[in-house]
């Protein structure tokens, strides 16, 4: 039987395990990336391991999240990360150089390579045929130290594309269509491979938009073939030597095949507050709009920006709308300036923001109270924009421009003729904002720069054979890592200070949680389906760990968050009968006996001491995961000789 594209890369990088869906496999990692909101903790963890130099082919530290620098905290963290990069062998992308995924696609990504990043949208690299996955910072630290990356061997889904996108219908609409079909949990446990004749009609930036938003499906990653379109992109970036052809075998087998005719798609929009709440744009026509944002790692390429600029040229943003534009990289911004497109954007009345994540993570440009904001981003979770009651819709750049010009949700096909955008044969190459590391000898003499906001990694406790703890919080379905550990301008500066950060844990759900959890000493959280979806931020595990959470019992878990819980020494356990969720109440005292035996058998019994009811739980921990939990987390496991 033939192999899929992903299976070929996995086979080439397989360290241990068998390529059977559901089995644990270990992969050699070629490249890593971090961003500053998760990077500080990842480098503290790496430093603790005592490895003198990163052992990957390439590791890059990006600064793209905490760029406001309204106090000393962000600037200190950036100095810390830069000093770590210089000493330990990483490249450092300076603030203003761009969003990690956009810059990595332009300057570093290579077809056929493995990449993990401490950001959930790392699968952007699948647009050029990388096996690129989001991971927790500790997993990234282990990979930098030469350790393997462990995942459950995924199933293989194929999306077969036919036809060609019509004018004003975009790759973003393809992303929203697959979300409409599969939902935010429909890709869990799978790799989404994109194929068919329609693939040949999509540029690398369009492909990267699609793989970027594959994260919202809960998929392990998404990937496109590496073909002549990939070659042309790499050659235009001056990296033609990085090209290799990658395609699936004709007899490759897939667990599910989905057909999408690109020619039949219409402009789509995701309504508040979930990326899979998808309807047609025309069905919402006339809805008043307060704000429009164009940018993010999903839609900030030169291709997207040129299209937006062409539609804005000679026009003026509606008086009732505030429009922001955030180019994805310094390369994009510079080329917009050179060709005059930047002038067209500014002349329309748009506000030009820094080449960074910005509004996508609530880092400025929050909408007004109850405001309707159309964004070319990938997530519209409640409160993520920085405005608790903000109504955020996800759209393509074309739909965003249509709303900015008319002041209401408008089908972009009503704008008239679509201006033709031609991509350059050569991109403008200037890597001066990427600082290389010191040589190994010089590095030995370098000092790490630490500010007072950087606090140690929280200590974890080895999992004992009996757990007795209060149920301190009960939450529902699709709880995101934004719910667990919010972001935004007020909170992100403290990502390297877990004690202070803990004050905001679950603040969206229950402001009393931090104090109640600390008072309980040790505790259990109960959740519904798809617990921990969204961002890869390990802080959503580290902060509960700091507050004494010992286990999370849910109907189901998102992949990255479940791994982060285990890495922190917290047990993710699943209801055998999901209906048992209803029988538990917040503040009940719960107990689990014979934990080690239950880990081995995959079956545990949780007793509600208030009602006397026994509830069956299940788990599927590998031997390695059991050892991590018994050690008190991955960092302690590595310290005891495991993992590297």
Question: Which residue stretches match the model-derived regions?
Answer:
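Fe-S-dependent hydro-lyases/dehydratases of central metabolism
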Residues: 1-644
């Amino acid at each position: 039987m033939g192999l899929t594209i992903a299976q070929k890369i996995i086979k080439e990088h397989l360290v241990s395990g068998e390529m059977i869906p559901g089995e644990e496999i270990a992969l050699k990692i070629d490249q890593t990336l971090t961003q500053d909101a998760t990077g500080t903790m990842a480098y503290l963890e790496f430093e603790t391991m005592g490895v003198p130099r990163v052992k990957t082919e390439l590791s890059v530290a990006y600064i793209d999240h905490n760029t406001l620098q309204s106090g000393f905290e962000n600037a200190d963290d950036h100095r810390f990360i830069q000093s770590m990069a210089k000493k330990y062998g990483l490249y450092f992308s300076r603030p203003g150089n761009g969003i990690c995924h956009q810059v990595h696609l332009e300057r570093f990504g290579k077809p056929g390579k493995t990449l993990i990043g401490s950001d959930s949208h790392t699968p952007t690299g699948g647009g050029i045929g990388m096996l690129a996955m989001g991971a927790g910072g500790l997993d990234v630290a282990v990979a930098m130290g030469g350790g393997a990356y462990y995942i459950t061997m995924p199933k293989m889904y194929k999306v077969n594309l036919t036809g060609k996108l019509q004018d004003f219908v975009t790759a973003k609409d393809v992303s929203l269509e697959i979300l409409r079909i599969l939902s935010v949990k429909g890709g869990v446990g799978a790799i989404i491979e994109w194929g068919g004749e329609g693939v040949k009609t999509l540029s690398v930036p369009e492909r990267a938009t699609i793989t970027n938003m594959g994260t919202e499906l809960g998929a392990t990653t998404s990937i496109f073939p590496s073909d002549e379109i990939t070659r042309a992109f790499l050659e235009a970036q001056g990296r033609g030597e990085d090209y290799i052809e990658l395609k699936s075998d004709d007899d490759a087998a897939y667990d599910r095949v989905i057909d999408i005719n690109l020619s039949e798609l219409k402009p789509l929009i995701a309504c508040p507050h979930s990326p899979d709440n998808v309807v047609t744009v025309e069905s919402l026509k006339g809805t008043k709009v307060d704000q429009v944002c164009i940018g993010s790692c999903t839609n900030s390429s030169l291709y997207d920006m040129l299209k937006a600029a062409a539609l804005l040229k000679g026009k003026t943003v509606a008086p009732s709308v505030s429009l922001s534009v955030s180019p994805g990289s310094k390369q994009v911004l510079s080329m917009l300036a050179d060709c005059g497109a930047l002038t067209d954007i500014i002349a329309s009345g748009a506000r030009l923001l820094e080449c960074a994540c910005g509004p996508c993570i609530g880092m400025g440009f929050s909408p007004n109270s109850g405001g309707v904001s159309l964004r070319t981003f990938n997530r519209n979770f409640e409160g993520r924009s920085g405005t608790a009651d903000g109504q955020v819709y996800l759209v393509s750049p074309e739909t965003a421009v249509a709303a900015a010009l008319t002041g209401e949700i408008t089908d972009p096909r009503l704008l008239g003729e679509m201006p033709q955008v031609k991509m350059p044969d050569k991109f403008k190459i200037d890597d001066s904002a990427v600082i290389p590391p010191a040589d190994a000898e010089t590095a030995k003499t370098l000092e790490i720069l630490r500010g007072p906001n950087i606090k140690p990694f929280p200590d974890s406790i080895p999992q004992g054979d009996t757990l007795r703890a209060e149920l301190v919080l009960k939450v529902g379905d699709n709880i995101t890592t934004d719910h667990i550990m919010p972001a935004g301008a007020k909170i992100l500066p403290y990502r390297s200070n877990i004690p202070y950060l803990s004050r905001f844990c679950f603040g969206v759900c229950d402001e009393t949680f931090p104090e109640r959890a600390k008072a309980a000493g040790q505790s259990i959280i109960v959740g519904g389906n798809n617990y921990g979806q969204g961002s890869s931020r390990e802080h959503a595990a580290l902060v509960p760990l700091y507050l004494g959470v010992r286990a999370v019992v849910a109907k189901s878990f998102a992949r990255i968050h479940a791994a982060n819980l285990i890495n922190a020494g917290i047990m993710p356990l699943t209801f055998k009968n999901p209906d048992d969720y209803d029988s538990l109440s917040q503040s009940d005292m719960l107990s689990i006996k014979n934990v080690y035996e239950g880990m081995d058998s995959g079956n545990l019994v949780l007793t509600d001491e208030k009602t006397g009811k026994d509830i069956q739980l299940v788990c599927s921990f590998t031997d390695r995961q059991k050892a991590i939990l018994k050690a008190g987390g991955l960092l302690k496991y590595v310290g005891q000789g495991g993992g590297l």
